[in-house]
Amino acid sequence: MTNEEPVPSTSSVLSAAEKNVKIETPSRKRKGLDIDALWRKKFKDVENQKSPEKSEKSEKTIKEEPLETHPSGERKLRSASKDSKSLSKETHNTISTRSSSSGTPRKKMEPEDVKPNIKMLKKSLPVSFQCSNLNDGTVGDASVMLDPTKISLHSSSVAYGEESQDEMEVIQHSTDDPNGTREEFDYNQIEYGNAVTPNGTYTLYAPDSNYAPYYQYSNNMQSSPQDNAPYLVPAPQSPVSIDDADSINLPNNQRASPATVNWLFENYEIGEGSLPRCELYDHYKKHCAEHRMDPVNAASFGKLIRSVFHNLKTRRLGTRGNSKYHYYGIRLKDSSTLHSMQHPQPQIIQNTYTPPMQLPQRDAYADTVNQVAAIKYMDVEIPDKRARKDNSSSSSSCRDSVSPCMDLPAQQTIQHTPVHSVIPSTQQPAPLHNNNVVSYVVTESDKAAMGKIDLPIVPFPDKDALMATIGFRKLGVGEEELNSLIDIYEILCREILALIKNIDFASVEDTWSKFWSGNFGVDRDHISALCTLDQVQDYIIEVDLALYQTIVDTLIPNVLLSELSTGMTQTCRTFAKNIDVYLRKSLMLANLGEFFVKKKIQAIKYLQQGLKRYTSLNHLAHASRGVLMKPEQVQQMYQDYIRVDINTVHQQAGWICGCDSVMVHHVNNAFKHNLQRMSAMEVWAEWLESIVDQVLAKYHDKPANVIANVGKQFLLNWSFYTSMIIRDLTLRSAMSFGSFTLIRLLADDYMYYLIESKIAKAGKQQLITVIRADKDWPLTTNPQEYIVVANDNDEDLDLEKAGLL
């Protein structure tokens, strides 16, 4: 039993045996309302009205004795009625501190007025619940029929007047034993009675021991961002971003692309002067639009600026009512192309400083306010407000988005690689014109991830069969020009592949432009004439698809096991976004037909799609590898997974999918076995491949369309089963839920990739061409299964909008 201070009339159950009952009622507190204090004040006022000289003794008695033992004689039960309900609101206003006034006479009250209606409670008491017997101090079992007269209620809540009970704060019950230790009890509560009295509504609760706790309590309150030590707090460890011990303190730079940082260095420099923040952000948004990047918000861009150019200060400059925030200490470079976008600004005064009050007119002040502020603060060291808030967090926008603060890893520097280091001196391309594209310095880890050191060989179709089907009478060209075109186009593909191997993406556009403008060994008129032939168009498209597949295989030789760095992944994705723009600009230099241009643009979309999907899959594999390398996380995953009722999952999912129960249990046991053994990523990859091989084993000699249909159905079944397992883990509040979600995403995407590989092998086609199969508009004269059509409604293929026609 606890020795807590009892609160009068918060709970009582039976009048016949009140002396055997003690009600344990922890305080119910909410903002601006102390229930215990209200009860003590109420009784003190009652005793003062009876006997003012005994008020002190009465107060002491209330503090030391519960309601049931208060020497007030025999208690009388009050029945709930409409009259009592109407009186409740009136007496509530009497005890409320908010509604009390000196002008209203206080109503004389008796101690009985504060008692709950126990008759209503008695009628609705449960026949069995956990409680303590005051006679012997024991706690009764939930299955034993107990006398309701000998119970100890664990908690209660009180609602005054018209206030909702949902607004009352529920406080966890706790007791202190004589040894000084504090014991807290977690239990589920059931509401079993309401008692309406003239002074309020009381809701009594008791623990329900028949229902085992399903959800674990977790504190949802977070500490204030102002209490964190660093200004930019790294994201906490999660299954998606597994940080090693050495990288915990690194800022998050996922949103700061190397192209943006390079653009800042090319156009801005630290120096005297100031730039309006809004204009600088407008420049940034235009840069993102030109490079097909998603711009961050203004607050995140401000953090990026401060991470690139340190010690920047912020000043609010301009006339009253028309002032703007400026970055002080940064200026545009003289060589920047942004000067054409810059608003005209008067030059900075270098020699004299004229106070604003001595200026003859307001316009002069408006014209020179920026220069005055710049000179005034030029040589004065003013403490920066941000320096005093190093330990504080930024605004809510910093928490809502990923911080773009740049701190590039070692050896991942940004610079332009000379073109002559990649292309042989005999065939140098034109000088580099696209300065906005960032070249990436290849590290040793990137070279190891590429796999092959030598240049991969691009397969070509049979040239003799092509030449045998072509008539040259009306073209004005002969067999020599055709052979020259085929040979030069092969050299072009090899040089493009060499640039890709050296991560010199900026030179790809120049190499294409040189070929289609007729400066690569073949006259432009000959190229235009030969490209009117369907056979030549089909040959070029086939070579392009083979080249694009080889580019993907070169950059990502193994989508699951290749360890691409963050800079390499971002560079590949940026290149995939912009490569169709490079091709459009190059094709404008040749006099090509509209149909052939559309097929070229559609073909390069395969490369874009493949690079984006496979870099995403590789990123998932990298994050999952971090989870699988930590034994404590894998052990927790195993403990959570063995609690999943796989029979129930199969019963629900099998009714829809109709899968073999033997195979389902085999996959389930293999998954648990891999978790228990803490298998490496290579083992998991082999296991997933074995599942696909087992599913498609009896279809190995079937056409590609049959394998595609079987593979699609398998992917649907796999996705449904995994979603049911994730649902079960969610309901159980599994601690490793995030890790399971990450592994599930990886498994789904890799299964998708494996099915694609099987279809491509059966159809003898390039892997990147499996998706978006449509036969309405083939890319070749003799359509194959995998050739994807160009959509007439696709704005990306609108040649007039693209400026090609």
Swiss-Prot record:
Ciliated sensory neurons. Residues 1-113 are annotated as: Disordered. It comes from the Eukaryota. Residues 1-14, 93-104 have a biased composition (Polar residues). SUPFAM superfamilies: Winged helix' DNA-binding domain. Keywords: Activator, DNA-binding, Nucleus, Transcription, Transcription regulation. Residues 260-334 bind DNA. GO terms for cellular component: nucleus. Gene3D superfamilies: Winged helix-like DNA-binding domain superfamily/Winged helix DNA-binding domain (1.10.10.10). Belongs to the RFX family. This is RFX-like transcription factor daf-19. It comes from Caenorhabditis elegans.
